[in-house]
Amino acid sequence: RDNYNSIDAYNKFNTDTELAYGSSFTSIYKLYMEAQVNYARKFGKHDVTGMMLYMQNDYRNKAELAERYQGIVGRVTYGYDDRYLFEFNAGYNGSENFMKGKRFGFFPSVSVGWRITNEEFMKGTQDWLNNLKLRASYGQVGNDIYKIGGAKQRFLYEQKWNQIGNDYRYGETWQSGIYESQYPNYGVTWERAHKYNLGLEFGLWNGLLSGNLDLFYEKRNDILTQYLTRPQWVGVAMAAANLGKTKNSGYEIELKHANHIGKDFNYTVGLTYSHAKNEILMMDEPDLKTDYRKREGHPINQYFGLVCDGFITQADIDGGKLPVSKLGENVGIGDLKYRDM
């Protein structure tokens, strides 16, 4: 994709310059390569499938360095008599954001399922119970992207330098200079999430009522985040590091009713309810920070602030137990009364 912009500009009258012409263009190229092999075979009560995929992505902006990603993905599934189901997936992904030796990460996942309604002992329920399936899964997911203000931060393992204007004087003239803006992190690598799921599916009366119940748990390790305990005397910003740990757990319930009125009108009604709770297990905080100010042990994006105990009354003022205001003004009747923490 090419974007062209040109400007014709006339200079101010009586200036000793010629007509100026300027042009600029940017070119963006994206090259994506993918090769895939599939396998499928059924014999007797056995059903086996397999897939292997290789991908490579090259994104180039004329004004920037190319972004490159590479990966291999594989999947194997096995089913026996449409009762016992097994699936294994694995990804081996590479990212340019990490230095050699840490660029590639291996992320496996496995799932099993049991279609109970296809068992011999369930044949007496097939007229009203059409589907009953129990499933469980475990998998790992990686993340290599770290952003500040929505901007992706690349090459966390590289030292960064910026130019600054009028930094020092040489004689009577101010000169520009350069300074180190980021200290590299040679050990940074993939952020990794471990996900667990246990689910139950059911279907009643030929689809009149169906639903799912899922229990999930996720623990995320090596979260890419900034240092918060960097001493000021260091003088240089530190690149992001694998400093954080969180957990997330909960459940989700889904119910659906499907039916028809006559031959031409079909309708579906659904209800979904979910509950989730997360917690910060570890982050880069000062060791001497008071407990009520620490974010460890609290939910992500937990609000921190003063606790209001109502409004100040005349009885509070007469009692003389109000704390002294730190805002430069004396408190009065009707002001918010904050709890002494």
Give the predicted meaning of each segment.
Residues 71-73, 259, 322, 329, ...:
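Residue-level marker of intrinsically disordered, low-complexity segments enriched
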Residues 305-307, 311, 315-322, 331:
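C-terminal segments of large proteins
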Residues 218-219, 320, 326:
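Short alpha-helical "patches" and their helix-cap loops
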Residues 1-307:
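Extracellular/periplasmic, surface-exposed regions of secreted and cell-surface proteins
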Residues 203, 254, 311, 318-320, ...:
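Intrinsically disordered, low-complexity regions of eukaryotic proteins
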Residues 1-14, 324-340:
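Charged, glycine/proline-rich intrinsically disordered loops and linkers
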Residues 115, 297, 313-315, 334:
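Helix N-terminus capping/helix-initiation residues
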